[in-house]
UniProtKB/Swiss-Prot annotation:
HAMAP family: PSII_Cyt550. This is Photosystem II extrinsic protein V. One of its GO terms (biological process) is photosynthesis, light reaction. Belongs to the cytochrome c family. PsbV subfamily. Coiled coil: none annotated. One of the extrinsic, lumenal subunits of photosystem II (PSII). PSII is a light-driven water plastoquinone oxidoreductase, using light energy to abstract electrons from H(2)O, generating a proton gradient subsequently used for ATP formation. The extrinsic proteins stabilize the structure of photosystem II oxygen-evolving complex (OEC), the ion environment of oxygen evolution and protect the OEC against heat-induced inactivation. Low-potential cytochrome c that plays a role in the OEC of PSII. It is found in: Cellular thylakoid membrane. Residues 1-26 form the signal peptide. PSII is composed of 1 copy each of membrane proteins PsbA, PsbB, PsbC, PsbD, PsbE, PsbF, PsbH, PsbI, PsbJ, PsbK, PsbL, PsbM, PsbT, PsbX, PsbY, PsbZ, Psb30/Ycf12, peripheral proteins PsbO, CyanoQ (PsbQ), PsbU, PsbV and a large number of cofactors. It forms dimeric complexes. Binds 1 heme c group covalently per subunit. GO terms for cellular component: photosystem II; plasma membrane-derived thylakoid membrane.
Amino acid sequence: MLKRYMLLAVATVFFAFQVLTSTATAAELDDATRTVALNEGSTVTLSTQQAKEGQRLFNFACANCHIGGDTKTNPSINLSSASLAGANPRRDNVEGLVDYMNNPTTYDGFDTISEVHPSTQSTDVFPLMRNLSDEDLFDIAGHILIQPSVIGDQWGGGKANR
């Protein structure tokens, strides 16, 4: 009987600890972490609500292929800061990423790929993009740009950095 009570006490402490602790949330991100490039000359500080919503929308519409910032269909191109900066046009800012989500192009920028990459142009093929507004795309872009500051090289770093 005493053994049963001890197990119950240990289980209660364990579950109480789980309830009282949580992973990092958008509310815990400071202003410096939530500040990202708006375009090539300006920055913007996302609100905690925008950061939270960006994470939710990314998980809803993008994480199937871009889990952890990697790209399942093309592992050589990921969502790391270096990859986004190397794209033409640059995609390492909010406006560049929103433009890409509206009009996706190849890494060199020469060819459109809206038929094979989810975008607001191809909602018939990729229905998850159907109801995303420009504000939603802004929040998703903010989430993508925040991640290198939150999880470092693990974001877009592939299996080697996990």
